[in-house]
Design a protein with these regions (language model features):
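A mobile, often basic/glycine-rich helix-loop segment
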Residues: 152-169
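Rossmann-like AdoMet
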Residues: 1-83, 87-148, 165
Length: 169
């Protein structure tokens, strides 16, 4: 059954759903969602992102992460987390620049927050030659908080469903 048919059936059986729930399902449903069923990003996809235009963007993010780690006192462990890493280009560029500080790379626990299996595969390919191998989680609440976190989130807000609130008084 198609996603459209499943959504229609669910609405008939249980009543209205919020726009946010509807958009979330349309984007991330594992069997019919936009990000789960097609390459959305890149030359063959529907859009490109800043890291795909120039490696300088990701490299500057990498240098910023190293500097932030140093300002944190160069802790022995730090979680470098990217939310919605697309095809992995930004992180690949960031890690390449971060090689200037091998101590930073030794401290990094790289975590990518990505629910889409096709995008996880693309990220794995992009980061295959990296000095650090990522760990994937599906959501931010899966990140451990026993070490400092450096969070990167480029172009992720436009992938989130909007929630509407109405003030009545």
């Amino acid at each position: 059954m198609s996603l459209k048919d499943r959504l229609a059936r669910e609405i008939v059986l249980t009543g209205p759903m919020t726009v946010a729930d509807y958009v979330t399902r349309c984007l991330h449903d594992p069997e019919g969602g936009y990000y789960a069923t097609r390459p959305a990003i890149g030359a063959t996809g529907d859009f490109i992102t800043a890291p795909m235009i120039s490696q300088m963007f990701g490299e500057l993010i990498g240098l910023w992460a190293v500097e932030l780690w140093r300002r944190l006192g160069a802790p022995e462990r730090v979680r470098l987390v990217e939310v919605g890493p697309g095809d992995g280009t930004l992180m690949a560029d960031a890690l390449r620049a971060a090689r200037l500080d091998p101590e930073f790379l030794r401290a990094v626990d790289l975590i990518l927050i990505e629910p889409s299996p096709p995008l996880r595969e693309a990220q794995a390919r992009m980061l295959a030659d990296s000095d650090i191998h990522p760990r994937w989680v599906a959501s931010l609440d899966r990140i451990e908080t026993d070490a400092p976190v450096i969070l990167i989130a480029n172009e992720v807000l436009d992938c989130l469903p909007a929630r509407q609130s109405v003030k009545t008084e």
